């Protein structure tokens, strides 16, 4: 039976597919870490209290990148170049979701509008990350090789999502509510399309590595398209709702270390 668990187990059991999976994940996390590090450095003076939380957000993502690279090293594997069509983070930036890298490379302070854009973009992408890690935690939290990494990253992603909810609600109370809802909607509708395209590309690469028969590849592609249809018809709304999280001030302290993955 084809299931999320059996699919990931197949990827996990093969060195080349595991190598590609970890390389894609590490690259995306490292890119997110750089983006958040730059945002933290450029936070406007009126929002300087937010800078340590943005920095913590970036530090967590840097840590996740190191964890995925450490998982490769543990199996004696080297990272591979990430195929362009599988680079989720880069494709989001290319399609104008979040803050442009050219803007972040400059030393010009961001505006409050920029910070709202960053938080709204993160609200959408962290929803996806939290859901994906929850799925892995459900099936692989006790796995001897990746279980600890899965639990740690999953907890961090839940913290990131809680942080986005709390800060966006703060900005909404300050009068930015309509702007937040507009950016959330635009980001969510773009994200579900990019997620579909990246998922199809990743499965195509995995299928060639693992020698999947055409029927299996077609079934997986049909499943990805079905998820997109569901999300386009209304599933995207889960990515734009805001509620006060149970985890308050989720990024209020320093990033947790992962010395065992150093």
Predicted regions and their residues:
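Non-heme di-metal
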Residues: 1-262
């Amino acid at each position: 039976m084809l299931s999320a668990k059996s699919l990931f187990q197949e990827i996990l059991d093969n060195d080349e597919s595991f190598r590609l999976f970890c390389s894609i994940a590490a690259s995306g996390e490292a890119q997110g870490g750089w983006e958040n590090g730059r945002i933290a450095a450029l936070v406007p003076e009126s929002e300087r209290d937010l800078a340590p939380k943005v920095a913590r957000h970036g530090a967590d993502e840097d840590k996740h990148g190191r964890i995925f690279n450490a998982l490769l090293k543990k199996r004696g594997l080297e990272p591979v170049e990430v195929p362009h069509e599988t680079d989720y983070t880069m494709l989001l930036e290319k399609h104008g979701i979040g803050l442009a890298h050219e803007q972040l490379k400059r030393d010009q302070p961001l505006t409050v509008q920029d910070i709202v854009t960053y938080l709204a973009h993160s609200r959408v992408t962290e929803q996806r990350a939290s859901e994906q890690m929850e799925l892995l935690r459900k099936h692989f939290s006790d796995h001897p090789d990746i279980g600890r990494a899965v639990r740690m990253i999953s907890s961090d992603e839940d913290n990131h999502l809680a942080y986005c909810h709390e800060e966006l609600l703060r900005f909404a109370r300050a009068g930015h509510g309509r702007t937040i809802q507009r950016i959330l909607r635009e980001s969510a509708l773009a994200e579900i399309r990019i997620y579909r395209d990246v998922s199809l590309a990743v499965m195509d690469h995995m299928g060639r590595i693992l020698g999947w028969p055409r029927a299996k590849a077609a079934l997986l592609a049909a499943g990805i398209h079905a998820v997109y249809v569901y999300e386009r018809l209304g599933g995207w709304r889960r990515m734009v709702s805001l509620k006060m999280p149970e985890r308050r001030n989720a990024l209020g302290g320093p990033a947790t270390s992962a010395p065992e993955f150093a």
